[in-house]
Amino acid sequence: MTPEMLKTVIQNNIKASLEITSPNPGLPVCFLQYTEQNFSRNFYHMEFAEYKTLLEQVSKALLEAGRQVCLVDFNPEQYKKWLKEKNLTDSQQTRSAFASGLGKGPEI
């Protein structure tokens, strides 16, 4: 992955998570936390190690900016069920909403 592509992924990840919590900045910004087994290289267009580093950097930056951060363990079966119940398709926005819902943030 090129540095420019990584920058775009970082920006999209932060943007999606912040859009969900922006109506209430007191809510934590939630991100999904994957294991190597349930991480999707095709979805994120990066390797698992890159994602872990990115997650650490983003979380640290948000904490330094005064935001709360929560990491939610990703459960693929639970996520698929949630998508079906909400009649949604897989996207960065829906993954962020799913993480926020599990992290007691707002749902879409």
Regions found by a protein language model. Name each.
Residues 2-44:
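Extended, charge-biased low-complexity segments
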Residues 49-106:
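Amphipathic protein-protein interaction modules
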